[in-house]
Amino acid sequence: MDIMKQTLLKVKNLEKFIEKHGEDPFISQSISKMLDYKIAKYEGEIKRLGKELKVFERAYGMKSSVFFKKFSEGKIGDNMDFIEWSSIYQMHNRLIEKKIGLEGKK
């Protein structure tokens, strides 16, 4: 069994335990701390990648969202800077989505 399946099984077992026996303050606090830790890690990475995006935005005089639309549509070249910029932009957006998911906003 792979790690993700094992983790999902543990989460389901925990859900069943809480439904049957009620809330456990220790479990609730542990889960909150794990989520807070992961959210903080994502925030740090988002900030770091955001700084990298700003370097490209200043160098090429356009916002990353505008660049990515043009790049995806093939309207600008595919030099190494653009490939790197595109990758960083996509990583940045994926991390934002993950963070929002952990925060329960999506």
Where are these regions (language model features)?
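Small, basic N-terminal interaction modules of short regulatory proteins
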Residues: 1-58, 62, 97-106
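Generic serine detector
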Residues: 28-32, 64-65, 72, 86-87
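Short E/K-rich amphipathic alpha-helical oligomerization segments
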Residues: 54-76
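Short, compact, well-ordered microdomains
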Residues: 78-104
